Structures are given as structure tokens and as C-alpha cells.
Curated annotation (Swiss-Prot):
UniProtKB keywords: Cell inner membrane, Cell membrane, Membrane, NAD, Quinone, Translocase, Transmembrane, Transmembrane helix, Transport, Ubiquinone
Protein's gene: nuoA
Annotated function: NDH-1 shuttles electrons from NADH, via FMN and iron-sulfur (Fe-S) centers, to quinones in the respiratory chain. The immediate electron acceptor for the enzyme in this species is believed to be ubiquinone. Couples the redox reaction to proton translocation (for every two electrons transferred, four hydrogen ions are translocated across the cytoplasmic membrane), and thus conserves the redox energy in a proton gradient.
Catalytic activity, EC: 7.1.1.-
Reactions the enzyme catalyzes: a quinone + NADH + 5 H(+)(in) = a quinol + NAD(+) + 4 H(+)(out)
Protein name from the UniProt record: NADH-quinone oxidoreductase subunit A
UniProt-listed Gene3D superfamilies: NADH:ubiquinone/plastoquinone oxidoreductase, chain 3 (1.20.58.1610)
Enzyme class, UniProt record, top EC level: translocase
Family per record: Belongs to the complex I subunit 3 family.
Native source species: Erwinia tasmaniensis (strain DSM 17950 / CFBP 7177 / CIP 109463 / NCPPB 4357 / Et1/99)
Main location: membrane
Length: 145
């Protein structure tokens, strides 16, 4: 059991830390405001790239494929962290841990094969389901103008 003085000392230290942290942040913001540049020209906030005036907008619409690849990366990266944690404790986990990790890897591979199967990782245009043969019009069936 901790005594009341230890609890108060612990909370007092946290309060001092919090006050000093907030004070330091305010000091840095105030210093930047006082020491920062005060240029207020007409073209101050316009973008400038190598002396060439920009044309158009900087807002580009990206394909959803970029977001999908980013989500897949995050998902599989988190699983890599789990495998790293397992690898550090492999001796303590024994064969049971090995079997669990093997099942975990198999589930990851099944997910990866599913993503490949549905074409989520394909950057090329959609594949054709069947070949379309070009039709030929015979000269006898052609209408004359």
C-alpha cells in the first residue's frame, strides 16, 4: 500500500510536468510570432516554383487504387509486427506457439491470394472475360448509298 504522501508527490510531479510542458509550448509559439517575418505583400501567399507562375490547381484526384494499396500495406505491416513479437518469444512459446504462428501465416497467405484473385493488386485495366472477334461485313450484304 502506498501512503497518501507518495500519491500526492506522484500527482504533484505530474502537475509540474504538465504546467512546464504547456508553458514551453506557449513560449515557443509566442517567440515565433514575435520573431517571425511580417511581410504582408499581395503575392505573399501565392505558390512559387522556380520562377514560373503556377497554372491550375494543386488538388489532384487520385485513383482509389492508391488508397487500397496503402490500406493493404498497413494491414500486412501490422501483421509483420505480430510476427516480430512472436519471433522474440519463440523459445518460450514452444511448439504450440509455432503452430499458432504457422496458422497465422497461412491466414495471411490466404488473404493475399484472395486479393490477387479478385484483382485488387492489378494496376492494368480489367482483363477480358472472353475474346471478342471482329466481325466482317461481306460485300454482298453491304448497303449501297
Amino acid at each position: 500500500m502506498s501512503t497518501t504522501t507518495e500519491v500526492v508527490a506522484h500527482h504533484w510531479a505530474f502537475a509540474v510536468f504538465l504546467i512546464v510542458s504547456i508553458g514551453l509550448c506557449c513560449l515557443m509559439l509566442a517567440g515565433a510570432w514575435f520573431l517571425g517575418g511580417k511581410a504582408r505583400g499581395r503575392h505573399t501567399n501565392t505558390p512559387f516554383e522556380s520562377g514560373i507562375a503556377s497554372v491550375g490547381t494543386a488538388k489532384l484526384r487520385l485513383s482509389a487504387k492508391f488508397y487500397l494499396v496503402a490500406m493493404f500495406f498497413v494491414i500486412f505491416d501490422v501483421e509483420a509486427l505480430y510476427l516480430y513479437a512472436w519471433s522474440t518469444a519463440i523459445r518460450e512459446s514452444g511448439w504450440v506457439g509455432f503452430v499458432e504462428a504457422a496458422i497465422f501465416i497461412l491466414v495471411l497467405l490466404a488473404g493475399l491470394f484472395y486479393l490477387v484473385r479478385i484483382g485488387a493488386l492489378d494496376w492494368a485495366p480489367a482483363r477480358r472475360q472472353f475474346d471478342v472477334k471482329p466481325t466482317t461485313i461481306s460485300h454482298a450484304n453491304r448497303q449501297k448509298p
